[in-house]
Amino acid sequence: SPLWFNETVGEVISSGGDYGKTELGKGKRVLVEFVSANPTGPMHIGNARGGALGDSLSSVLQFAGYEVEREFYVNDAGNQIEKFGKSLSIRYMQIADGNKADVIASYGDDDVCRKIFEDEENFPMPEDVYKGVDIIEHAYNFYKINGGEFVNADEESRKCALVEYALPLNIDGLEKDLAKYRIVYDTWFRESSLHKSGAVKQIVDMLTEKGQTYEKDGAIWFKASDFGDDQDRVLVRANGIPTYFVPDIAYHYNKLVTRGFDKAIDILGADHHGYIARMKAALTALGVDASKLDIVIMQMVMLVRNGE
């Protein structure tokens, strides 16, 4: 009724922004992890949408009395960082050496190379690298600072130096881009810290001690199907390298056990839907209450420009 409407509007105005505020979550700590874009390049529109969703959800939870921490998980370890380093190294060698044939030869079979743009003058790159302009810019700026100092260095040293230079710049860029639409994080949690602390190895050891792993084809498998997943999952490949799943388990164990949050919320794209069952299976196998993990799936959208 008009009377109710007028009274309610008056209450909203007089509350000074606290209308509807509750203490529903008083004393409960919630960690909301969102965006967590790959730090090897700039954000895409999906990351930006995830930022708006995650930050809004965090604000709603805070308004309901929860103690909320916003967290960005920095994937600064694993295959994508190796790929990042290789991409930077090739571009640096191109800029520093200037001899295309020699640089291509240093990476083996040039049949795997191709042009990244239509320009015939452009340098051919292997398929398994990042080909964006940002890689060229990083390599060029690194060369301006260091000159040809790393041309004769071994490849691993060159890649490490380039990653140590470029990765912090990318992370800083992500932080600044997010701040442009008022998203500020309490924590930037690095995946590499889980490897350095031994937490990744500890997860495999714990699951093995609990009898939840087995060996097949030289790899170590987790009995995920015993805990609601549709299949068992490889933890450690036959070459001894853990799959990405292991640090992910370690990260969620860190959230709920090591740091003791009452609830952990992940904002993920719809392409990660299958991730839910396997992560909850791993937590359950480790003796962690999997209901403490909520995964919010963000649907994909299609952007149209000029009808295309």
Annotated model-derived regions:
Residues S1-E308:
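NTP-dependent nucleotidyl-transfer catalytic core
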